[in-house]
């Protein structure tokens, strides 16, 4: 009987952990895109980006190959 209770508790705790991981991954994906888009918009709206600015983020015309 103790083994059955132990197995049930273990299964429930594993399910809870898996559910939290899946939920946090979904929320992370949902929030990352708008934040990245907002950062790109603000960065690209600046007139003079810093010299070490990454071309992949803003496609800075000063960088070759954008």
Swiss-Prot record:
What are the coiled-coil residue ranges?
none
User: How far does the signal peptide extend, from start to end residue?
Assistant: 1-19
- The disulfides recorded in the entry are 54-59, 55-63, 58-66
For molecular function, the Gene Ontology terms on record are: toxin activity
Q: Which UniProt keywords apply?
A: Disulfide bond, Enterotoxin, Secreted, Signal, Toxin, Virulence
Prosegment location in residue numbers:
20-50
The protein's matches in PROSITE patterns, at most eight in alphabetical order, are given as: ENTEROTOXIN_H_STABLE
A Pfam family recorded for this sequence? Enterotoxin_ST
The places in or outside the cell where this protein is found are: Secreted
Signal in keyword set: yes
Superkingdom of the source?
Bacteria
- Mind naming one GO cellular-component term on file for this protein? extracellular space
Q: InterPro entries in the record, alphabetically? A: Heat-stable_enterotox_CS (IPR019806), Heat-stable_enterotox_STa (IPR001489)
Question: Which family is annotated?
Answer: Belongs to the heat-stable enterotoxin family.
Q: What does this protein do?
A: Toxin which activates the particulate form of guanylate cyclase and increases cyclic GMP levels within the host intestinal epithelial cells.
Spell out the protein name for this chain. Answer: Heat-stable enterotoxin
Naturally occurring in which organism (per UniProt): Yersinia kristensenii
